[in-house]
C-alpha cells in the first residue's frame, strides 16, 4: 500500500476547513443592572475603558466615569457609558452545562507551557495536548531544549534537563548511554501528587558486577526495530505514565525547594485531582500504536469526589512483522475529601507493562527479549489547617504525603547458540575444579526476576508570620523518609549464560546466579528540612521574594547539607531572578549490590570422543558490592531577567550546573595465583590433575565508583506573546543553548596494557579524554484558537541550530605505570616523554567532531483539534508536515530528526 503525500496533505487541508466550518457558538449569560434597569445578555468578553472590574463576595461591578463593552460572537456589541459615581452591576447566571463544557471553549485556556515565579515551567489544560501524547514523555517534548522525537514506544523513555549529553528524550533515533547521559537521567526525580515515584530499586540487569553503571541490559535490535525495556539506573520510564488523568505538570530545571531531595538534574511534579466529570472515551492511533482510555468522575457528596481511569496502549515497531512490541495497561482510582480545614487525597494505581519480542524466522541466531512488569502503588495526601488564622499563625497547618509501591519485574533474554560444547565456570568460591560443558547447540537464556519495594513519607508543618515592617514569612519544617528493597529471585539462567571458554588459557568475567532477596540489603534515606518563603512589597510597588531553604540528608549513612535559595526582585514590568543550591542523589540498589565478581580461567581441556570430556577451570572470587558509594552531588546556579512588554513577556535564564561525585567505572588491577597443574591421562579414564605450584597472573576488573564530573552552562529563552484578538492567534517561542564538558576525576586514570611487552611495566596510566558537547535548539508555536467554535489549529516548529560533539585527542604519554607487583608509580610531568617509557606511548587518536557541524535543520508539525457540542472531540496530528529531509553536513541522516508521520485522537464525552 502506498500513499501519495500530495493527496494526504490535500485531505488534511480539507479536513481542517471542514472543522472550521463546523464551528458552533458559545457565550455566558449574565444579568446587567444599569440606571435602575436590568437586562439579560450574552457575554464572551468584557472590555472596560477608563475603569476596572471590582469584585467582592457578593457582586461584580464597574464604577466611575468609563465605558464598558460586552461582546459575544454572533451577537451585537452591548455598550454602556457610565458617568461619575454611576455603577454597573453584573450577575453571572449559573451555567447548567458548565460541567460539560470543554476547556478548549474557554478563551483564557492555557495553550503553551508557561514559566512561573522563578524558572519553574507549568504545562496544563490544552497545553497538555499540543503534541499527540501517549505518555508523559511526549508531553515534556515541548519544554525549552527539547524537540519532537521520532515516534517509537518500544524503547524506554526518560528525560534530562539543561545538558548537551545525548538526546533529550530517548527515541528511535538513538539510545544514549555512557556516564554523561546516565548520570543526568538518573538524577531526575518524578513525583505524582507530591509522592516520589522511584526507580532506585530496579535491578533488571544481568552483569552489573562487571559493566558500566549505565550500560544497557536486555536490549536487542532487528530488522523490525529496537526493543529496550525500562533500565536500571536511568530513572523512571516515562512510557509508564499515561496522560488520561493528569491535571497539570510542573517542571523545575533549576533549584527546587528544600522539601525535595534525591535528585541532581531536575524535578517533575505531576498533579491529578478527583472531580465530577462525564464519562469520557478516548482512542488514539499513530503508526503501529493505538491507545484506548476511559475516565469518569463522581461527586459522592458535597465534600467527596472519586475519579476512575483506565488506559490500554499497544505499540508495534513495525506492523508488517510484529516482531517488536510494547503493551501498557494502567488503572487509577483517586478519592478526595475536602471539608473546611481537613483535606485528604487517596490514590491507588495498578499497571502492567510488557515488552514482547518474537523470533525472526529469517534470523536463526537472533536475540529475543521478553519483559513482564506489574506494579501496585498506594499514596495518600492529608492536610489539616488549624483555625484562628492571623498574621502570626505559627502553625497554620500540618500535612503528610505517604506512598507505598511494589512491583513484580521479570525479564527474559534468549537466543540460539551453535558453537560446539564449551567449558564454563560454576564455582562460587576460589577453587580449581572440573568444569561443566555446554551442549553443542542450545538456547541460551538469562533471566532477571525483581520484586522492588519502596516507601516514601514526608511530614511537614506550615506557618506564616508578618512582621511590623510588613515582611511576610511563609515557612515550613519537615522530615522525609525513604525505604527501598528488592525481594526478587534475582539473576539466573542456563549453562554458560554469560561467558564460555573456547581454548586453554582463555579467561574472562563469569556470571553466577544471584538472589536479590538473600543478598540485597534495604536502603534508607532520612532528611530534615526547613524553608522560609519571604515576600516584601515596598512603597514604590516593587516586590522582593526569596525562598530560602536548608536540607540535611542522610543517604545510606552519607550526610549532605544542601542550602538552597531562589529570589527575585520585581520593579514594575522588569524582574531580576537568581538562585543557587546543592542537591544530591543516592546510588541505586543495582549500583550498590552487584554480587561477587567471578574471574574464570581455563587451565586445561581434554576430550576423548565417546569416553570423556575433562575441563580444568580455576575461579577467583572478588567481593563485588559497592557499599562505600556516596551520593552524587550537583551545585546549581542560575540568574534570569523577565520583562513584560505590551505585546509579550520575555524570560531569559542563564545557568551553570556542576555535577560532582557522579557514578562511573574504574578499572582495578588484580593479581591471582594461577595454578600450575600436572595432568595424568590413563587410557579411557577421565584425566586426573594435581596442583604443583602457582604463578602470578595480573588482570583488570571494573568497579563502580564516585568520580565523574561534568559542567553544564547555557542560556534559556521563553517568550509568551499576548493573544492577537483580531487573528485569534497565540504565539509562543523558546530557545536554549547549552555547553557540556565532562571528564572523570583526576584520580581515575585510564589503564591500558602496552602493545609491546615490557618487563618493567604491566600497565600504563593515562589521563581521561575530555569531551565537550554543544547544543542549541529553538521552537515556535502558532495556535489559532476559536474558543466559541471549540477549534485549535496549531503549528509547532523545531529548529536544530547547533549540535556538536567534540572529543579531544587522547593522552599519548603516560602519567604513571603499574609494575608486575601491582605497585603504582607516577611519572613526573617533565619525564612523561622520556624514551624510558616509549613502550607505554599510545597511538595518537585525532580530535573528533560529530553531529550537525555547521548545518542547521528545521521541522514543522501540525495539530488540528475540533470540539463538537455533541460531545465528540477530534484531533489530527502530523509530524514533519512538509516531509523535510534530515541530512547533516556530511550527507548522513540526522537521527534526531522526526520523519513524516500521521496520528489522530478521538474522544467522546457522554
Question: Locations of the language-model features?
Answer:
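Short, acidic, small-residue-rich periplasmic hinge/interaction motif at the N-terminus
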Residues: 29-49, 71-75, 87-129
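N-terminal periplasmic "start-of-domain" segments of outer-membrane beta-barrel proteins
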Residues: 47-59, 104-139, 143, 156-160, ...
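N-terminal periplasmic accessory domains that precede
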Residues: 87-96, 136-139, 157-160, 191, ...
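Extracytoplasmic beta-strand/coil segments of soluble accessory domains associated
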Residues: 137, 141-221
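C-terminal beta-signal and adjacent terminal beta-strands/loops
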Residues: 219, 659-661, 799-844, 854-910
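Outer-membrane beta-barrel transmembrane domain signature of Gram-negative proteins
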Residues: 428-544, 592-595, 762-768, 809-811, ...
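Gram-negative outer-membrane beta-barrel transporters
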Residues: 538-540, 656, 677-809
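Outer-membrane beta-barrel signature, preferentially recognizing the C-terminal barrel domain
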Residues: 584-660, 679-689, 694-722, 771-774
Amino acid at each position: 500500500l502506498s500513499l501519495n503525500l500530495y493527496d494526504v496533505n490535500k485531505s488534511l487541508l480539507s479536513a481542517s476547513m471542514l472543522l472550521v466550518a463546523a464551528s458552533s457558538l458559545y457565550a455566558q449569560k449574565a444579568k446587567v443592572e444599569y440606571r435602575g434597569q436590568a437586562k439579560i445578555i450574552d457575554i464572551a468578553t468584557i472590555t472596560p475603558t477608563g475603569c476596572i472590574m471590582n469584585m467582592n463576595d457578593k457582586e461584580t461591578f464597574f464604577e466611575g466615569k468609563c465605558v464598558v463593552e460586552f461582546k459575544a460572537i454572533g451577537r451585537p456589541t452591548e455598550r454602556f457609558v457610565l458617568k461619575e459615581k454611576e455603577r454597573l452591576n453584573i450577575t453571572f447566571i449559573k451555567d447548567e452545562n458548565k460541567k460539560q463544557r470543554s476547556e478548549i471553549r474557554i478563551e483564557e485556556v492555557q495553550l503553551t507551557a508557561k514559566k512561573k515565579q522563578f524558572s519553574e515551567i507549568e504545562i496544563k489544560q490544552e497545553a497538555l495536548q499540543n503534541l499527540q501524547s501517549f505518555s508523559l514523555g511526549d508531553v515534556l517534548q515541548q519544554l525549552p531544549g527539547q524537540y519532537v522525537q521520532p515516534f517509537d514506544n518500544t524503547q524506554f523513555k526518560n528525560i534530562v534537563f539543561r545538558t548537551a549529553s545525548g538526546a533529550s528524550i530517548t527515541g528511535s533515533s538513538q539510545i544514549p548511554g555512557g556516564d554523561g547521559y546516565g548520570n543526568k537521567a538518573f538524577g531526575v526525580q518524578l513525583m505524582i501528587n507530591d509522592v516520589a515515584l522511584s526507580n532506585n530499586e530496579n535491578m533488571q540487569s544481568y552483569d552489573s558486577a562487571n559493566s558500566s553503571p549505565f550500560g544497557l541490559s536486555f536490549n536487542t535490535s532487528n530488522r523490525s526495530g529496537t526493543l529496550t525495556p525500562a533500565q536500571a539506573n536511568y530513572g523512571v520510564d516515562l512510557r509508564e505514565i499515561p496522560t488520561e488523568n493528569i491535571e497539570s505538570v510542573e517542571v523545575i530545571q533549576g533549584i527546587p525547594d528544600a522539601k525535595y531531595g534525591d535528585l541532581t538534574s531536575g524535578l517533575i511534579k505531576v498533579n491529578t485531582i478527583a472531580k465530577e466529570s462525564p464519562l469520557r472515551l478516548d482512542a488514539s492511533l499513530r503508526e503501529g500504536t493505538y491507545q484506548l482510555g476511559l475516565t469518569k468522575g463522581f461527586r459522592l457528596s458535597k465534600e467527596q469526589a472519586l475519579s476512575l481511569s483506565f488506559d490500554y496502549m499497544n505499540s508495534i515497531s513495525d506492523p508488517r512483522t510484529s516482531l517488536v512490541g510494547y503493551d501498557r495497561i494502567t488503572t487509577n482510582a483517586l478519592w478526595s475529601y475536602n471539608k473546611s480545614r481537613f483535606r485528604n487525597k487517596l490514590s491507588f494505581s495498578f499497571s502492567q507493562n510488557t515488552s514482547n519480542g518474537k523470533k525472526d524466522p529469517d534470523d536463526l541466531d537472533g536475540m529475543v527479549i521478553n519483559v513482564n512488569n506489574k506494579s501496585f502503588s498506594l499514596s495518600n495526601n492529608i492536610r489539616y489547617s488549624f483555625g484562628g488564622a492571623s498574621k502570626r499563625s505559627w502553625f497554620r497547618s500540618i500535612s503528610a504525603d505517604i506512598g507505598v509501591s511494589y512491583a513484580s519485574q521479570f525479564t527474559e533474554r534468549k537466543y540460539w547458540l551453535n558453537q560446539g560444547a564449551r567449558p564454563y565456570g560454576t564455582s562460587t568460591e576460589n577453587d580449581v575444579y572440573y568444569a561443566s560443558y555446554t551442549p553443542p547447540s542450545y538456547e541460551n537464556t538469562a533471566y532477571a526476576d525483581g520484586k522492588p519495594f519502596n516507601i516514601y513519607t514526608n511530614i511537614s508543618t506550615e506557618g506564616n508570620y508578618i512582621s511590623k515592617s510588613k515582611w511576610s514569612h511563609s515557612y515550613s519544617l519537615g522530615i522525609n523518609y525513604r525505604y527501598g528493597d528488592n525481594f526478587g529471585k534475582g539473576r539466573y539462567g542456563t549453562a554458560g549464560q554469560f561467558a564460555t571458554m573456547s581454548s586453554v588459557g582463555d579467561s574472562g568475567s563469569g556470571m553466577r546466579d544471584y538472589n536479590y532477596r538473600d543478598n540485597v540489603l534495604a536502603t534508607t534515606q532520612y532528611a530534615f528540612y526547613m524553608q522560609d518563603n519571604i515576600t516584601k512589597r515596598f512603597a514604590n510597588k516593587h516586590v522582593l521574594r526569596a525562598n530560602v531553604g536548608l536540607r540535611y540528608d542522610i543517604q545510606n549513612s552519607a550526610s549532605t547539607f544542601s542550602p538552597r535559595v531562589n529570589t527575585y526582585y520585581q520593579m514594575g514590568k522588569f524582574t531580576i531572578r537568581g538562585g543557587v543550591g546543592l542537591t544530591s542523589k543516592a546510588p541505586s540498589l543495582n549500583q550498590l549490590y552487584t554480587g561477587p565478581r567471578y574471574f574464570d580461567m581455563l587451565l586445561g581441556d581434554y576430550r576423548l570422543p565417546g569416553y570423556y570430556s575433562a575441563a580444568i577451570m580455576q575461579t577467583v572470587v572478588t567481593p563485588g558490592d559497592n557499599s562505600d558509594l556516596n551520593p552524587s552531588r550537583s551545585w546549581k546556579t542560575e540568574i534570569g531577567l523577565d520583562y513584560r512588554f505590551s505585546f509579550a513577556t520575555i524570560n531569559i535564564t542563564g545557568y551553570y550546573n556542576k555535577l560532582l561525585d557522579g557514578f562511573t567505572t574504574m578499572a582495578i588491577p588484580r593479581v591471582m595465583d594461577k595454578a600450575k597443574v600436572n595432568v595424568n591421562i590413563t587410557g579411557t579414564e577421565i584425566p586426573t590433575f594435581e596442583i604443583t605450584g602457582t604463578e602470578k597472573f595480573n588482570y583488570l576488573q571494573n568497579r563502580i565508583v564516585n568520580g565523574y564530573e561534568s559542567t553544564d552552562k547555557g542560556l534559556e529563552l521563553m517568550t509568551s506573546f499576548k493573544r492577537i484578538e483580531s487573528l485569534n492567534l497565540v504565539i509562543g517561542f523558546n530557545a536554549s543553548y547549552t555547553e557540556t564538558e565532562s571528564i572523570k576525576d583526576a584520580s581515575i586514570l585510564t589503564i591500558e596494557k602496552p602493545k609491546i611487552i615490557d618487563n618493567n611495566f604491566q600497565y600504563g596510566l593515562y589521563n581521561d579524554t575530555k569531551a565537550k558537547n554543544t547544543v542549541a535548539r529553538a521552537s515556535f508555536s502558532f495556535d489559532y484558537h476559536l474558543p466559541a467554535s471549540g477549534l485549535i489549529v496549531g503549528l509547532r516548529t523545531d529548529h536544530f541550530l547547533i549540535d556538536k560533539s567534540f572529543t579531544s585527542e587522547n593522552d599519548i604519554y603516560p602519567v604513571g605505570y603499574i609494575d608486575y607487583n601491582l605497585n603504582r608509580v607516577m611519572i613526573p610531568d617533565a619525564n612523561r616523554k622520556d624514551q624510558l617509557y616509549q613502550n607505554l606511548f599510545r597511538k595518537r587518536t585525532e580530535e573528533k567532531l560529530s553531529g550537525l557541524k555547521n548545518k542547521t535543520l528545521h521541522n514543522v508539525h501540525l495539530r488540528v483539534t475540533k470540539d463538537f457540542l455533541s460531545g465528540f472531540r477530534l484531533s489530527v496530528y502530523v509530524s514533519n508536515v512538509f516531509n523535510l529531509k534530515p541530512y547533516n553536513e556530511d550527507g548522513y541522516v540526522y537521527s534526531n530528526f522526526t520523519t513524516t508521520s500521521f496520528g489522530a485522537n478521538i474522544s467522546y464525552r457522554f
